[in-house]
Swiss-Prot record:
Keyword RNA-binding: yes
GO function term, MF aspect, one: structural constituent of ribosome
Entry similarity comment: Belongs to the universal ribosomal protein uL23 family.
UniProt name for this protein: Large ribosomal subunit protein uL23
GO biological process, one term: translation
The organism's taxonomic lineage, starting at the top: Bacteria, Bacillati, Cyanobacteriota, Cyanophyceae, Nostocales
Described purpose of this protein according to its UniProt entry: One of the early assembly proteins it binds 23S rRNA. One of the proteins that surrounds the polypeptide exit tunnel on the outside of the ribosome. Forms the main docking site for trigger factor binding to the ribosome.
GO cellular-component term (any): ribosome
InterPro entries the record matches: Nucleotide-bd_a/b_plait_sf, Ribosomal_uL23-like, Ribosomal_uL23/eL15/eS24_sf
Quaternary data: Part of the 50S ribosomal subunit. Contacts protein L29, and trigger factor when it is bound to the ribosome.
Pfam families attached to this UniProt entry: Ribosomal_L23
Keyword terms of this UniProt record: Ribonucleoprotein, Ribosomal protein, RNA-binding, rRNA-binding
Top-level taxon of the source organism: Bacteria
Length: 104
């Protein structure tokens, strides 16, 4: 992903991460997403701004350690993923909540 191609931006963000910690961080306008491991912060910022039509203030990334997975006598690892914590501008919070959590 060396080139900055706007057509590839939607493929960078895989899914939102909805854990207890991520839910608490949503109250501080911080949203957590799983992204491709090779995605950079500027690419993540552009993808979130393009997908949700919001202003991104800050992007923090983390590569959590791989977890062991055992099947019988064989030991393997779960796939590597990258976590992006995106801070949204206070005025745009309702836009992203409507997309992530539509009312039924």
């Amino acid at each position: 992903m060396a080139k900055f191609d706007p057509r590839n931006l939607p493929d960078l963000v895989r899914r939102p991460i909805l854990t207890e910690k991520a839910t608490i961080m949503m109250e501080q306008d911080k949203y957590t997403f799983e992204v491709t491991p090779k995605a950079t912060k500027p690419q993540i910022r552009a993808a979130i701004e393009d997908l949700f039509q919001v202003k991104v203030v800050k992007v923090n990334t983390a590569l959590p350690p791989r977890r062991k997975k055992r099947v019988g006598k064989f030991i393997g690892f779960k796939p590597q993923y990258k976590k992006a914590i995106v801070t949204i501008a206070p005025g745009d919070v309702e836009k992203i909540r409507q997309v992530l959590f539509p009312e039924v």
